[in-house]
Every structure is written in structure tokens, then in C-alpha cells.
Amino acid sequence: MQEVIKAVNERGIPLRVGVNGGSLERPLLDKYGWPSPEALSESALNAVHALEDEGFTNMKVSLKASDVHHAIDAYYLFSTQSNYPLHIGITEAGTAMTGAVKSAIGLGWLLSHGIGDTLRVSLAADPVEEVKVGFEILKSLELRHRGINVIACPTCGRVEIDVVRMANELEKKLGHIKTPLNVSVLGCVVNGIGEGKEADIGIAGGEGKGILFKKGKLMRKVPMDELMDTLIQEVELLAEEKEAEAAGAPHNGSSSEQAEAGWELMGHTPDEQSTIVRDIPVLPSKS
């Protein structure tokens, strides 16, 4: 241990104390009977105290378990007993889909309660996907603001456009944009415009044509075969505007032609609009 401490001190780098439910010390397994959250927390505290006894404090701690509830409990318990930074993650989470879900639930709960300083999403997939999922978790909790956030409605009998294809295409074609923007792809105008109020820009399907809107305000009708290209162009222009505003520089403005505001554009009245109230549920920790 002294050699490790000497090496990291010479290089001025922190040390990560990593505790894993799959490799817990035998005495703690005998004491608790299984790799419980209490056992994980005690193991981490023992390691921290051993390093402190050597005069070393430049560290962060991780307590990983593949069970979401056990990981949450372990991190929460340790956070009540120590102030060291926490590297959070659900280890061996699973494949791209199941691992992303487990990580989103576990890391989302911890982060929403102020627990966690760095994170790792563990997937049996391309490591690039791990980074993408991690950023999406942070973006969903509004802890990081970078890139396009595509908001798309589920398919139903009212959809007038191929929402699934267009949403996926948007994520790929707008992946180069770093400016944080909410972009909506909504299948119809019945609920679409109301739901799109929280988006910076978006489109909704109509009868033989689509509509372009910004912040829930109708901008203009667009032929179906031009809808995707128009949205991509407008998103890129909006990103440029926001970047210029952030830099304090003038910009040329959007090429959108301001259409007459109101639902009359698509033959609907304002009272058909709807709004969404989004609540972030809190996952109770299982004891």
C-alpha cells in the first residue's frame, strides 16, 4: 500500500477505492452472510481508514453491485458515513438495453438525491454506448446540457408521419451539434403542439403536410417530403443562433418565415391544445 501511495503522490493523481459485491473480503461475508449493502459500505470504510492512517486522502470511492437496490443502499449508507467523492455505477448491468435501464434507474435515483460525483455505465456493448447512456442520464436529470435531446411520441392511430424512423434519423444527423436543444418529433397535431411547448423546435404530422413549430408556436406548413430536411436545417440554424448569443456575437437569424400564429393553420382551435406536467418519480430504496 505504501508503494502505491508513493506512486500516486509522485504523479499527483487520485486513487479510487473500489469495492465490488463479487469480491468482498471473507471476514465480512462471514459477518453479514452475503455481500449486503452494509458489508460493502464497511469494506469501503475499512479501506478508506487504512489509507488515511498512511496520511493519504486524495481518493474517491465506488461500491458496485449488479442488483440495483443493493447498489443504491450501499452508496446511500456510505454517503451518510463519509464525505469522500463517490464514483457510482451498477456493475455487470447487462446488455445494451437491460444495462441501460438498470443504470438509468440506479444512477438516476442516486444523482437525484445528490449522491455521486463521477459515474460509469457498464454495458455488454460497445464502450461508446456506455458514454452515450451516461450522458443521456445526466441530460434527463438536467445535470449536463450538451447536444440534441430528441422528444418523440409513441405511435398510435393518429400518427401522420413515420415517427420512429424520423426520430432515429434526427439523432444520427444532428449528433454533431453540441448546443443543448430539445427537438420534438410528434405524430399529429391533436396533442402534438401542446406537448411540443417544452421543445425548442419540432415538427408534427398533419393531413398531407407537416407543421414546424418553435416553443409550441406554429411557424409554417411544410410538405411531407421536405419535412425532415427542413427540420434539420432549422435546428442547425437555431444552434448557431444560440452559440452566437452565448458568445455575445450577432447572428443572421433563422430563415423561418413567421406564419400567422394560431391553430387555424391546421384547421384547429387553441382550446384543442394540451399541456404536460412531468414529475420525476423517486424510487424507494429496498431494505
Task: Identify the role of each PLM range.
Residues V17, V61, L110, C153, ...:
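Conserved, mostly hydrophobic/aromatic
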Residues M1-L24, L29-Y32:
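Active-site-proximal beta-alpha core segment in soluble small-molecule metabolic enzymes
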Residues M1, A96-G99, F213-K215:
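Short, charged, surface-exposed secondary-structure boundary motifs
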Residues N20-S23, L28-K178, N182:
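Catalytic alpha/beta core domains of metabolic enzymes, predominantly
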Residues I177-V185, I201-S287:
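Iron-sulfur (Fe-S) cluster-binding modules
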Residues N9, T80, K197:
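Anion (oxyanion) recognition and catalysis
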Residues P127, C156-E160, L170, V189-A199, ...:
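Conserved structured catalytic cores and adjacent interaction surfaces
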